[in-house]
Amino acid sequence: MVNDYKEAFAFYTQKLHFTLVEDTQLSPEKRWVIIAPPGGEACSLLLAKAATDEQRSRIGNQTGGRVFLFLHTDNFERDYKNLQDQQIKITRPPVTEPYGTVAVLEDLYGNLWDLIQPIKSF
């Protein structure tokens, strides 16, 4: 969930280089906004604007502080440098795990993402 379509769209497209897949006005207050990461033809993200106080209270903590979004890359160094260049908050620096190289980043609302370059054989 997002506070504002415009600010969320700007963050994901300008800082993470996502592209717009669909933007349909459903009502004066509601849009169907779908974005996708670079090379993410099989993956997309719906930007759903919080509509109630309860929903707004959960923005940025929809999973109780756990990582729940995973951004796969074929070039970890390039994409990690982009995160740094865009001044995106890194909450856990890169580490090499048995399954690949991973760092944890925070989006504009505090949601946690893994940037991960999986090991091909894993």
Where are these predicted regions, by residue range?
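Vicinal oxygen chelate
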Residues: 19-72, 80-108, 116-122
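Conserved active-site tyrosine of GNAT-family acetyltransferases
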Residues: 8-13, 83, 110
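Helix N-cap motif at beta-to-alpha junctions
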Residues: 5-6, 74-77
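Conserved beta-strand-loop-alpha-helix junction that forms the acyl-donor binding cleft
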Residues: 2-5, 26-28
